[in-house]
C-alpha cells in the first residue's frame, strides 16, 4: 500500500525528471551569463549615462555570445500551470482528508508542530514544518541561481539579493496555513532541483568549454534573430523617438 505522502513525492520526482532538459538548458545559460559578467560591467560603466545605448550594447553582447538572459525564468513559467493545478487541488482533495504522512496528520490541511498561543499577523497561531523546509530549499535554490546572474544590477531590474530573501519569506508566511501536501511538493521539488543542478555543475557541464565557446561566438558577427532582434529594434525605435522629441 502506497501512502499519499509517498505518492506526492513520486509525482514530484516524475515532474522534475520531465523538467530536467529545461533545467539543464537554463543552468547552461546561467553559466554563460556568469562568464559575461565582466563584459556587462564594462558596458554599464561605459554607458552609465545612456540607458538606451547600454541596453543596445548588452543585447548585442547576449546575441553574439549565444546567451539568453530570460532563460532562467523558463522553468518557473512552465511550472505555473502545474502550480495553479496543485494549488487548487490540495485544499479540496477529499482523498487527502485525514491522510497522514510523517508528522502531518492531514495532507489537505497545515502540518502544525507547535501551537504558539498567540496570533502573528499573516502567519497564524502555529508553526508548520513543511513550509519551513520548503522555504529553506527555495532559499538555497534561489541563492544558487542568482549567484550566476550578471552584476551590476541593471536600472529598472529587481534586486536579485532582495528576491533571494523575499521569496522564501513569502513562502513561509503564505503556506503556513495551507495544505501540507503542497508544501511537501515544493520542498521535494526544490530539493531535487538543487541536487540536479549540483550534478549538472560537477559532472556534466565543463565551464572551460562553455567559456571558450562564448569567446568564439563573441568574435563572430551574428545577426540578431527572434526575440533579440525584436527587442533591439524596439530599443532603436525608442532612441529615434527620443531624439525626435528633443528637436
Predicted regions, residues:
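Helix-loop-helix
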Residues: 1-247
Amino acid at each position: 500500500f502506497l501512502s499519499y505522502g509517498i505518492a506526492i513525492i513520486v509525482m514530484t520526482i516524475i515532474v522534475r525528471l520531465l523538467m530536467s532538459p529545461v533545467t539543464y538548458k537554463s543552468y547552461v545559460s546561467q553559466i554563460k551569463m556568469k562568464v559575461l559578467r565582466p563584459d556587462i560591467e564594462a558596458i554599464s560603466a561605459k554607458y552609465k549615462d545612456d540607458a538606451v545605448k547600454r541596453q543596445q550594447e548588452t543585447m548585442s553582447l547576449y546575441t553574439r555570445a549565444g546567451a539568453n538572459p530570460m532563460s532562467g525564468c523558463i522553468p518557473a513559467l512552465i511550472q505555473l500551470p502545474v502550480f495553479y493545478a496543485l494549488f487548487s487541488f490540495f485544499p479540496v482533495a477529499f482523498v487527502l482528508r485525514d491522510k497522514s504522512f510523517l508528522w502531518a496528520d492531514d495532507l489537505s490541511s497545515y502540518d502544525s508542530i507547535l501551537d504558539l498561543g498567540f496570533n502573528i499577523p499573516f502567519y497564524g497561531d502555529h508553526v508548520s514544518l513543511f513550509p519551513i523546509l520548503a522555504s529553506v530549499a527555495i532559499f538555497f535554490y534561489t541563492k544558487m541561481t542568482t549567484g550566476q546572474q550578471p552584476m551590476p544590477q541593471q536600472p529598472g531590474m529587481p534586486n536579485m539579493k532582495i528576491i533571494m530573501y523575499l521569496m522564501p519569506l513569502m513562502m513561509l508566511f503564505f503556506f503556513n496555513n495551507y495544505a501540507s501536501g503542497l508544501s511537501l511538493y515544493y520542498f521535494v521539488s526544490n530539493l531535487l532541483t538543487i541536487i540536479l543542478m549540483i550534478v549538472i555543475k560537477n559532472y556534466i557541464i565543463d565551464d572551460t568549454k562553455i567559456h571558450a565557446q562564448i569567446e568564439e561566438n563573441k568574435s563572430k558577427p551574428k545577426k540578431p534573430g527572434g526575440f533579440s532582434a525584436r527587442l533591439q529594434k524596439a530599443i532603436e525605435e525608442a532612441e529615434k523617438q527620443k531624439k525626435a522629441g528633443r528637436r
